[in-house]
Amino acid sequence: MASPVQVNPAGTLAQQALASAPEGMLIAPVWRRASAFVLDVLALSLLMHLLTGQRLLLTLADTSYLTGGPRFLASWAFSWALFMTGFWLYWKYTGRAYHRSLGQRAFRIALVHDDGTLLDDHHWGPRARSKLRYLVPVVGWFFAVRDLLRARSPGAEHRTAIDRAHHTVAAVDWSLPSETRIGLG
């Protein structure tokens, strides 16, 4: 029969959650994570804007398309679909190629499992889809602020909701074991 009393190991919840992490692995600071995300969004938005003849961002921001009739509404909806699909593809395939986005690479952030190993290819599609919530105007800001506050909290194991859902940790890349660093792009 199991005892009704359970003895937990010492340490904070964050220390217990990351107990399987390699010794010396550092969690990436929130400011780096936010800056990497902003860099990704600015760079890819600008690239897509230029590739669409400088119309994409103007169409996304123009709410008069909603009242201009079905043709304008379809154009507005297509622009949002193109915008979201572009980001999903970017995060999915840079994750598969480099095990992080280019913004995360610039800020020396690596996304790894709790034990410090690299993510497999099948993790990047769902993770990219989860990050799209931050791009939705107004609602995305709520999710972003909530997750940034969670990522600063030891009680939330210094993880965002996406990290917790996908069992990942955002670590500083130079603090990872050498066999993990070799696999990073």
Predicted ranges, named:
Residues 23-26, 70-77, 127:
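Membrane-water interface of alpha-helical transmembrane segments
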Residues 25-35, 41, 90-104, 118-185:
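Juxtamembrane cytosolic face of transmembrane helices
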Residues 31-36, 74-83, 126:
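Alpha-helical transmembrane segments of integral membrane proteins
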Residues 2-6, 35-51, 183:
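Alpha-helical transmembrane segments of integral membrane proteins, especially early/N-terminal helices
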Residues 105-115:
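Juxtamembrane inter-helical linkers in multi-pass membrane proteins
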